[in-house]
From Swiss-Prot:
Pathway: Carbohydrate metabolism; D-galactose 6-phosphate degradation; D-tagatose 6-phosphate from D-galactose 6-phosphate: step 1/1. The keyword Isomerase applies. This is Galactose-6-phosphate isomerase subunit LacA. SUPFAM superfamilies: Ribose/Galactose isomerase RpiB/AlsB (SSF89623). NCBIfam families: lacA, PRK08621.1, rpiB_lacA_lacB. HAMAP family: LacA (MF_01555). GO terms for molecular function: galactose-6-phosphate isomerase activity; ribose-5-phosphate isomerase activity. The keyword Glycoprotein does not apply. It comes from the Bacteria. Belongs to the LacAB/RpiB family.
Amino acid sequence: MRVILGSDLDGIKLKAEMKQYLLQEKVEVIDKSESASEDFIEATLAVAHEVLKDTESLGIVFDGYGAGSFMTAAKIKGMIVAELSDERSAYMAREHNNARMITVGAKIVGTELAKNIIKEFLTGHYAGGRHQIRVDMLNKMA
């Protein structure tokens, strides 16, 4: 599994902490913003486009509140994204919605919660079946 990371100035510290966490967990990490992007849009687009190149990749963007990056990624055709601040939603975003990318607000989510969100997001597996109908609907929208 490969995880693509990005952040703006507000998310750079949490992104760095989560990058270390992922590397310790033996996850392949690609950091699209080694130095923080000045704007969440730039960081989000870099991560989303990289994720869409490889069906096995997932993306995580850190900004101040998660909302801006979410709105940006949701505009990209083929990208299913969730703005997250709890573990259960992270798991369900993968299992029922086949989310390939999440956004996390560094001013809302602390280090330990971010680790748990990422763990649930990465361990969730898309269930398919009846959920595929809504995934197809989402993919037709953008």
